Amino acid sequence: TIILTIILAFTGMCLRPPLMIPFVLAKSQPIPGTTLDSDNAWNDRFRAIRWDNDSDRWLLSTSEGFISVNEDFTGRPVKIPSSTTPPVSPMGITVFEKTTPGQWLIGSFSGLYNWNPATDKITDYYSGQPYSPAGKGRPLSAHLISGYSGDFNSQEPVVFDYYKGAENMPEMPDILRDQPMSLWNFALELHVGRAYEPIIGPFSELFVFLSGLTLLIILISGLVIHNRHHRRQKQHKIITNKK
């Protein structure tokens, strides 16, 4: 039972940063016989698809990057070089919208960018500055974009930030502001550690990792002490029987 609990604690730690990041970036072969073991080339790679009127082709967002395909998918898919496309977080694309002719808005936890596939021009949505790769590091931006909508009755589109919430939204009505949080949402906030952010600040992101590490130390040290105590008792019985 304790071995199973150790496995559960460690695998749970891998579902949140920092252990999650190397697992997300790493690639491995699927386990034979599982749902990921498929002959379909798009299986677990396809993320989103949009029709591009300017090029009369489909634009696809995949785990391998952006791909261009002709209208009826009879031609060979063409992978667009990553150096000419906006960065997309391993967590997946969250905004894939055409704003004006030739212009696309691409968003993810790696930021929000304006992209012109024809000219390969990429600019930051907030600063307007040209995008330049930052190199290897944490695959997250200062703006963790979780959604976008241009359907609200407002002058500016509404961008949803993971931490800041919705931008350019009208003030929340009192009837909604005073609504209590559901028990499910409250339990989720406790589970991932976000509920502790007012207390421990940015360390709340490490809550799952630190609590899992503490649990592992307790379990492993307890297992070691238990085994030592068991061996001593066994040796004591052997000595007693010999006497």
Map each language-model feature to its residues.
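Repeated scaffold domains used in trafficking and secretory/extracellular systems
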Residues: 37-51, 84-101, 129-152
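Membrane-interface segments at or immediately adjacent to transmembrane helices
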Residues: 21-79
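Short coil turn/linker residues within repeat-based beta-strand modules
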Residues: 73-75, 119-121, 173
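Hydrophobic/aromatic beta-strand positions that recur at structurally equivalent sites within the blades
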Residues: 67-71, 114-118, 226
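Residue-level signature of beta-propeller blades and closely related beta-rich strand-turn architectures
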Residues: 64, 109-110
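Beta-propeller fold detector
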Residues: 76-82, 123-131, 180
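Internal alpha-helical transmembrane segments
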Residues: 1-30, 193-242
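Extended, hydrophilic extramembrane loops/domains of integral membrane proteins
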Residues: 103-106, 113, 152-192
